[in-house]
């Protein structure tokens, strides 16, 4: 809003990292955020989904940049044991990351596979009652994240808004990203290099169990992700 009133400039740009109206309930704050897309700025967006939204829904002139990862940290390694293990990007303080949905999905998967191990990272979840065995890493360094991905057969990363950097990092570490379906994801991930799931705990659990039962399918996706 300040930039809209600032006129001593040749051009005005808007760095759009996510669809910020989705950060709020559909009320005043949602409208305030959405209105910023109608102020005539030129958009620079994180990824193609946001570029298309800005162009098609708001008439904004917009260009995008693609995602990447730090190849000095996220490197392909082989999992060193046969223990079934999954990673979940757990962010209960960030509603758009679907913490509750992911927890329900993993709980259902654990019921089907009682020997499953789960690694949480993204936030400290020690105050939550979690019925299955898990490691609570909390907020960690990129190197700890990379080491965690390598240990896991699959990494569950759910998002209701723009895709995070995690799927690329997971693939770079020779693990398999399990991502929620939608145009906000499929501009970068697809059913060749990732596992795409609905926003349904039972469907997520069934899908992940199926890949555990068919490791050759999982290996194919892992290879294409690299």
Regions found by a protein language model. Give the residues of each.
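Membrane-proximal helix-turn-helix segments that form the acceptor-binding/catalytic region
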Residues: 26-43
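A short, well-ordered alpha-helix in the C-terminal region of glycosyltransferases
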Residues: 217-226
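Conserved catalytic-core segment of nucleotide-activated headgroup transferases in glycan assembly
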Residues: 56-57, 69-133, 139
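Short acidic/histidine- and often glycine-rich active-site loop of Leloir-type glycosyltransferases
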Residues: 169, 181-196
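Acidic donor-binding loop of glycosyltransferase active sites
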Residues: 150-162, 175-176
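Conserved acidic donor-binding segment of nucleotide-sugar-dependent glycosyltransferases
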Residues: 191-202, 210-215
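Acidic anion/phosphate-binding donor-loop and adjacent secondary structure
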Residues: 21-27, 63-83, 147
């Amino acid at each position: 809003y300040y930039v809209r009133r600032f006129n001593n400039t040749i051009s005005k740009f808007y760095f759009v990292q996510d669809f910020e109206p989705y950060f709020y309930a559909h009320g005043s704050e949602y409208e305030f955020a959405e209105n910023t897309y109608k102020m005539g700025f030129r958009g620079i967006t994180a990824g193609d989904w946001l570029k298309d939204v800005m162009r098609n829904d708001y008439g904004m002139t917009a260009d995008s940049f693609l995602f990447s990862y730090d190849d000095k940290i996220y490197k392909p390694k082989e999992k060193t044991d046969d223990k079934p293990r999954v990673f979940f990007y757990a962010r209960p303080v960030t509603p758009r990351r679907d913490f509750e949905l992911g927890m329900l999905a993993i709980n259902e998967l654990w019921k089907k596979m009682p020997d499953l191990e789960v690694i949480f990272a993204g936030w400290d979840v020690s105050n939550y009652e979690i019925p299955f065995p898990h490691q609570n890493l909390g907020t960690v360094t990129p190197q700890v994240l990379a080491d965690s991905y390598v240990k896991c057969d699959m990494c569950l990363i759910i998002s209701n808004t723009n895709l995070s950097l995690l799927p690329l990092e997971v693939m770079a570490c020779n693990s398999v990203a399990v991502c929620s379906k939608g145009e906000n994801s499929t501009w970068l991930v697809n059913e060749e290099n990732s596992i795409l799931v609905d926003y349904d705990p039972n469907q997520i659990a069934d899908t992940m169990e199926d890949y555990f039962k068919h490791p050759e399918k999982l290996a194919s996706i892992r290879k294409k992700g690299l």
